[in-house]
């Protein structure tokens, strides 16, 4: 059984329920009055595991932070004038303030222990593919795309090499994109003018693998590509004919074995 703790106890539960009710479609139906949004964000910042932990409580009103508790400071501080009365009030509540200071252990370190196995220690190996953005590849400006998908955690390093020499100029990236299933993807592109015989390599380093993943793309002329495709097509066609021939052969053999020899009955 997984038990996640929330700071604030029943106060937080009541606040969460209230916000959910106020933001529901039924509550907003037919209401044309100005709406106000109150948010409470609780953040845990971990450094080197749980060796050093920082707890933050941020009070946000209409997308503007007005009040903050920082465990490194030990008390509430007003970010705007709107938050000053609340800061003075909460700092006067000694028991409540001690609970906030203890949240580093009771909230952050506790939940770290609960979720470490499926968050911090989780590893999913990336899938890497390389392809040109345009079909006309040689002697023209092109983008070579290195697609890295389905990996976790998000820390990753992608490099481009041309003929074993790292390429740094002309490299652009989409940055990390969340897939929505606890995995990430990214596209790292190299702007270049491919020439026949050149070998481009996308190298990916990620915590899920012990050694870098590499995928090559070789620049080939259209005639070379046509010859290669013709060779592949001929090979596949040969396999089909071979399979058909073997099928007919074994079928005939089975038919012959089922025939009984005829002779005179004495």
Curated annotation (Swiss-Prot):
Signal peptide: 1-29
Gene Ontology MF annotations: MHC class II protein complex binding; peptide antigen binding
Cysteine disulfide links: 44-108, 146-202
Record bears the keyword Transport: no
Residue ranges that the UniProt entry lists as topological domain Cytoplasmic: 249-266
Extracellular side: 30-227
Domain of life of the native organism: Eukaryota
Annotated family: Belongs to the MHC class II family.
PANTHER family the UniProt entry points to: HLA CLASS II HISTOCOMPATIBILITY ANTIGEN, DR BETA 5 CHAIN (PTHR19944:SF97), MHC CLASS II-RELATED (PTHR19944)
Protein name: HLA class II histocompatibility antigen, DR beta 5 chain
Species, as recorded: Homo sapiens
Gene name of the record: HLA-DRB5
